[in-house]
Amino acid sequence: MPVKLRIFLSHGEASCAKEPETFLGSNRVRPMSISNSIKITPELVASHGLKPDEYQRILDLIGREPSFTELGIFSAMWNEHCSYKSSKKWLKTLPTTGPRVIQGPGENAGVVDIDDGDCVVFKMESHNHPSYIEPYQGAATGVGGILRDVFTMGARPIAAMNALRFGAPDHPKTRHLVAGVVAGVGGYGNSFGVPTVGGEVEFDPRYNGNILVNAFAAGLAKSNAIFLSEAKGVGLPVVYLGAKTGRDGVGGATMASAEFDESIEEKRPTVQVGDPFTEKCLLEACLELMKTGAVIAIQDMGAAGLTCSAVEMGAKGDLGIELDLNAVPVREERMTAYEMMLSESQERMLMVLEPSKEEVAKAIFVKWGLDFAIVGKTTDDLRFRVLHNGEEVANLPIKELGDEAPEYDRPWTPAKVPAALSETDIPEADIADALVSLVGSANNSSRRWVYEQYDTLIQGNSLQLPGGDAGVVRVEGHDKKALAFSSDVTPRYVEADAFEGGKQAVAECWRNITATGALPLAATDNLNFGNPEKPEIMSQLVHAIKGIGEACRVLEFPIVSGNVSLYNETNGQAILPTPTIGGVGLLKDWGRMARIRFAAADEVVLLVGAPAGLGTHIAQSVYMRDVHGRTDGPAPHVDLIAEKKNGDFVRGLITEGLTTAVHDCSSGGLALAVAEMAISSGIGATIDAVEGHNPILTFYGEDQARYVLTVKKSDLDKVRAAAKAAGVSCPLIGTTGGSTVKLGTARAVEIKELHLAYESWFPQFMDGETLIAAE
């Protein structure tokens, strides 16, 4: 039974008189000492994303009915987006440490040592729900948020990537969403001044009602100058930095923790609005401030805004926080405490300040045209107090709000792995026709239309641009050192077998970084799944995390940051499970960096990691999906020992200067890998068939742990000797040269034909000239 309130208007928030005592369920609720203007009903509680048992937990915790503002605070802090309550148990199983890890999960971003007193700071996170509702602003503020995560740690951003998933190309909303998201990513990143060096774009009907926008950013910092969010010291000023607070984004974190339904348009006001030029000023002001010794702790205001940043800083430091909302800079009149606490206005920071540096800090932010306001203080009582118009509108236990939020062990079903395909169940197709079809398909064609809208060269350090295996950026101040970045996942594999799919996402990211010659250092995960309250969805999440963990351990590729996005469903239809992995690698000498394009004619082509017949696994391949419309059978097995051995071997060859081109072998198998190498270089290749082996398996099988290499004929004996010593399969499979790609006995396909198909699909789709389904 809801508490009965009699509401009287006052100059501040409405005050309320209540019965001396009331009952809610079986619990006696003490009279509230905090004024309230809104009646707390079961419907209101449900609209805040809180389950009845969670609301009962709140009542038990605080011993009274929460105020409306407190209800909003609990809703924000206890939702999936902020608390990770459904995934925390399993995230704890991931490997997060290593010899180069300076800071693992739990901070704004991960930090990894790259020698010479330098470190790379990076993270990937989602902005899925906002980008579907308002694609331009949703994507733009996703980029802004991840950039703030990086420079909050004291790092200057040097690279960005984005992994985008859209619905079927023939869905009426897809073209609009692609245009808006790509424009938003480019509009923010380009204006801010960070190069976009890689990413993914894929289409599938399962994303029709719930697209994915996963944004990655990396920055450089000094290893001895990393800034954390843990508040320290009692009675110290809590300072608001950056842009003013408005009503945009109120309830955004709660919206991001719920499924979509017919009311989706009503959620448009929960999408934030970004300003990249203000963010650029905020970056410069923060980095300047950090050099003064004024910063004790700092946290960006992202999901749940002022609420989450204040609670996290206090809870991590075992301190209380007191805020006075009348000191918060606002850009709209008559904002309520609820709105100010839950606003997700962009380009804002919260800091615990060294008191003696107040005037120095203020002068820096005034110089950059940004707000600087002391809005509170740290306390020693572990309480989160919020004052507004002279009244206390919230008084809650800060640890229970923050790092002691609810944690669930949700039920999950055993994994179900599809049966293997029989040899007689492999459909035939003309090898050459299939190749032309695949390079010109929705999911395998060039993404040039997308990445040419991004500034890939700003800052002047980009060495490899989108279109290769990984983006590569030179480390400024060093003649030879560079960093490689890649983002990968194959959702159809995860759908078929979440454990193997999780392993494969890590392995392909590691492989792409290795293919440049870089040593993979560490990774960030962005786990996108449906409703975890459904055991079959929770099973996908659990098994994917198990697979990710196993791969990271074997490949020595720890997870140092990440994000979980659940409830990616519309009207009960879940997305494909999509655990995106972003990785970073170190090139000690970028002069030895490998590229995917063939370097010259009359060189030999080798396939590292080749199984018998060069390829064997056709189930869940793009050949089956895009040529024959089938998505059955198991995902390919990922032999992690082979991945490590083969990758280390390839990296060694690159470092020794024995390769002239390198490309990982993944979706589309050997055929697509060779075609992409030929298209990017304009040099053809002839690849031999394997006598007695099905050519479909040879050319389109998606066996893992493979690389296509080219080497000069004069170096072939050295490479073969090295392969034998390493115990690595590395057969010679063909030669480069000519103007065609010839696979076995199939007709030779002109590179011009492949290039036209490869480059045409995306611009034709966006111009409305083609509606090829991604099925």
From Swiss-Prot:
Record keyword Ribosomal protein present: no
List of residues binding Mg(2+) 2: 149, 300
A single GO cellular-component term on record: cytoplasm
Enzyme Commission identifier(s): 6.3.5.3
UniProt KW keywords: ATP-binding, Cytoplasm, Ligase, Magnesium, Metal-binding, Nucleotide-binding, Purine biosynthesis
Residues binding Mg(2+) 1: 125, 563
Main subcellular localisation: cytoplasm
UniProt binding sites for substrate: 126-129, 148, 272, 344-346, 565
The protein's annotated pathway: Purine metabolism; IMP biosynthesis via de novo pathway; 5-amino-1-(5-phospho-D-ribosyl)imidazole from N(2)-formyl-N(1)-(5-phospho-D-ribosyl)glycinamide: step 1/2
Similarity comment text for this entry: Belongs to the FGAMS family.
PANTHER family attached to this UniProt entry: PHOSPHORIBOSYLFORMYLGLYCINAMIDINE SYNTHASE SUBUNIT PURL
Name of protein: Phosphoribosylformylglycinamidine synthase subunit PurL
